[in-house]
């Protein structure tokens, strides 16, 4: 049991990058994929979705960068995790989707942040 407790402590001390690397190594060693259970859950959620009438996933669309394009690029980078060039390309290619399949609350937060930066945004 002491070995298991030490293992738990060691795993808890890992950084996110180290945990991701560990996951890859275990997948290779055991010949499995960590993505399989997620796909099953997504299929189950997709099957239940037609029963619900209310939309649960929203897309945030940047329709115009406005006058303060630099501020909008900064916020797009923060929201999406894109690099500077990719965020700039996305902003300049408006109308363009910033984030897809997010909850209503998250979509509204993203819309508010982008509008405060000077952009025009649509939530679909």
From Swiss-Prot:
Key word Zinc present: no
InterPro entries registered for this protein in UniProt: Ribosomal_bL12 (IPR000206), Ribosomal_bL12_C (IPR013823), Ribosomal_bL12_C/ClpS-like (IPR014719), Ribosomal_bL12_oligo (IPR008932), Ribosomal_bL12_oligo_N_sf (IPR036235)
Gene Ontology process terms (BP): translation
Domain of life: Bacteria
Keywords: Ribonucleoprotein, Ribosomal protein
Cellular-component GO terms for this entry: cytosolic large ribosomal subunit
Subunit relationships: Homodimer. Part of the ribosomal stalk of the 50S ribosomal subunit. Forms a multimeric L10(L12)X complex, where L10 forms an elongated spine to which 2 to 4 L12 dimers bind in a sequential fashion. Binds GTP-bound translation factors.
Function: Forms part of the ribosomal stalk which helps the ribosome interact with GTP-bound translation factors. Is thus essential for accurate translation.
Protein name: Large ribosomal subunit protein bL12
Origin species: Paramagnetospirillum magneticum (strain ATCC 700264 / AMB-1) (Magnetospirillum magneticum)
